[in-house]
Amino acid sequence: MSELKLPELFGSRVFNEETMKERLSGACYQAWKRCVTDGASLELAAANEIAGAMKTWAVERGCTHYTHWFQPMTGFTAEKHDSFIAPSDHGRVILEFSGKNLVRGEADASSFPSGGLRATFEARGYTAWDPSSFAFIKEGTLCIPTILCSYGGHALDKKTPLLRSMEDVSRQAIRILRLFGDTESRRVIPCVGPEQEYFLVDKKMYNQREDLRMTGRTLFGAKPPRGQELDDHYYGAIRPRVAAFMKDLDENLWALGIYSKTKHNEAAPAQHEMAPVYTDANTACDHNQLTMEVMKKIAEKHDLVCLLDEKPFAGVNGSGKHDNWSLNTDTGKNLFKPGKTPSQNAQFLLFLAAFVKGVDEYQDFLRATVAFPGNDHRLGASEAPPAVLSIFLGDELDAIVQSIIRGTEFKEAGKRTLQIGVDAMPPIPQDNTDRNRTSPMAFTGNKFEFRMLGSSQSISGPNIALNTIMAEELQQFADQLEKSKNFQSDLEKLIKKVFTDHQRIIFNGNGYDDAWIAEAEKRGLSNLKSAADALPVYTAKKNVDLFVKHGIYTKEEINARAEIHIENYTTVLTIEARTMADMLRRQILPAVSGYAAELCERGWKKEQMGVSHKADDAVAREMGQLTDKLYAATEKMERDLSKIPADAKKAMAYSHDHLIPDMEKARELADRLEELSPAERWPFPVYSDLLFSV
C-alpha cells in the first residue's frame, strides 16, 4: 500500500466526525456535538437527519442491512441484522432508516446472561444508540454501537456502566482541577491503550484437535524439545505467513478507524502482539472488541486460527492484555504527566496519591475484574504479574514519595544519560522510570499499565473499576480541600497522609520472587490466588457500596455481574473436563492401548525367534501401568462431573477443588503416554507441530 493511500484508507468504513461535517447541516452537526460533549438531548428531527445521512453513506458503500452492535455480559459482541428495505407500492421496496431506528432498537434479551435481573419469560430488552461511538461498516452491514438495557431499565451490557464511570471520574477530576486554578478544562477523559497478545496456529492442525475447537486451548500436550528457551522469537523476524496476516489485519483495522500502531513477535513460539494508539476508554473498548473479532476472521482467510485464550499451550508464555490507563483533559493535558520535575508538581502528586490510595483500598475488587479460569493459568506463574496487587513507581518517583513521607527534602538526581560505549553514538537521555514487567500496576511515565488482564477478556470491567475507584478518591479529596482555609498547607498534609497510610501497596522489586509474596502477606495485602477466591469479593459490602454510591451499578446490577462470573467459572471448567474425558475415551486411551498391545505382540514374536525384547517389554509395561491409571483418572473425573452442586457458589468451589486436580492428573498421565508413543500413532497434532508450523 502506498503512503498516499493510507490516509484515504484510514476510517473509510467509519461514519466519523469528518463525514458528519460533510453530510449534515451545520445545525444538526452542532446538535450532535452538544449531545456528545454536554449530554444534551438530541431532537427527533436531528436524529432523522443523522439517520438519513448515515443510511445514504452506508448504501453508497454496499450496505444492505444495519444492526445495533452491543456488548452483553458474555464479554463478546452481539448483533441482530435488519435490512433497509420497506414495502412500497406495486410489490416494490424502498430503503428506509429513520431516527427512531437509529436511536432505539428492541432485542430479545432472554438468551443473554442477566444474573437474575429479569425472569426467563421477561424477554424484552432495548438497545439505545451511543452517539459518542462512531457507526462503522462490517461485511455489508452498518453497525451502530449501542447500549443494552432490560425492560425495567437495568444495564445488561458492559458499555453502560463504562460510560457512567467515565462521566463520574470526569466530574470529580474537574473539581480538583478547579482548586488548582484550571478554569478551561470542561471534561476529563479516561484514555486507554490495550496491548493485545494472541497466538496463530495452522487451521488444519487446529481442526484436528477437539480441545482447541471446544475450549480454545490445548488440554493435553507434552513439552516439545524446544520452547522459548533461546529467546529468539521475541521481536524476531516475522515469518512470511504471519507477516501477510498482520498486513491484512492492519489494513482492515485502519479502515475501521482503529489505530493499530505496533506489531511484533512475542516471547512464545507462534505468539504475537498488536498495540494501538491510546484513545478514550469508550472508543478503546469498542475498538478492542472489534480487533479481537477481526483478528479471528482475517486469520481464517490465511488458513490460520487466532487463539485468544490466556494459556493455549502449557510450558510457554500465555497471552495477556496490558491496559494502559490515564486521565486527560479536553484541553490536552495528561494528569499523570509530571511537570518539569515531578517534585514541583503538586497537582500530579495529588492525582498520584488518589490512585495509590484507591488501588490499596480496592485491591481485592481490581483482582476480581481479571478473575476467570483462563487467567488463573497465567497470574503468578513467572510469566505474568502475581495475583497480589501492588504499584510500581520507579526509583525517582518512589524517592519523591519517600521524601514526602519522611518530611525530608528530595534531592533531584538530574537527568541521567545512558552511555553506549561507542564513540560515534551520542549519550541517550535516560527515562525516570524503568519498565518493571513483573508488576501488576506499573507507572510508565505518564500512565499506569494494568498488566493483569487476560487476552480474551473485555477491557470494560477493569476500566470501570479504575474510573470508579479514582472518582471515589478524588471526591474525598475535593470534599476536604474545597473547605480548606489554607489550601497549600492542607494539600501538603493530605498528600503526606495518603502516601504514609497507603505506602504498603508500593513495591518496586521483582514480583516473580517468592519472597515478595511473603512480604506482601506481612504488609496485609490480599493474595487471591485463584478466580474462585477472587470472585466472591464482587459482593463485599464496601465494593457494592462504592459502585452504588457513584451510580455505576445498582445493587442488583453488581450482584448480577457477580453471579454471571461465578456461573461462568463452573461452566468453563465443566466444558474443559467434558472435552478432556471425550478425548481420553475416544482418542487417547484407544491409541495407547492399541500401541501397548502391538508392543506385547512384537515382544512375543521376538521371544519366539530368540531376539531380545527388553525395550519392547519395558515400554509396554510402563504404558500399561500408565493406561490403567489414566483410565481410573478418567472415571474419577466423570464421577466428579456428575456431582457438581446446583448452588452457583458451591459449584464454583467444587469445580476448583475437584475438577482442576482431576484434569491436572489426567493430563500428567496422558502427556507421559504421548512421550512414549510413536508420532504416527498419536491421534492429533502435538506441540512441536502446532507451535512451529506457521
Predicted regions and their residues:
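Basic/polar N-terminal segments that are highly enriched at the extreme N-terminus
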Residues: 1-7, 692-694
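C-terminal amphipathic alpha-helical interaction region
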Residues: 495, 500-694
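Glycine-rich, acidic/polar active-site loops that bind/position phosphate-bearing ligands
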Residues: 123-308, 317-320, 327-565
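Active-site-proximal loop/turn and secondary-structure-junction residues that shape catalytic pockets
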Residues: 46-50, 70-72, 100-101, 148, ...
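Active-site proximal loops enriched in glycine and acidic residues that flank catalytic Cys/His/Asp
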Residues: 46, 70, 98, 276-278, ...
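Hydrophobic/aromatic-rich, well-ordered segments within soluble, folded domains that form packed cores
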Residues: 63, 67-71, 287-301, 327, ...
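Short linear, low-complexity motifs centered on an aromatic residue
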Residues: 75-90, 107-110, 209, 216-218, ...
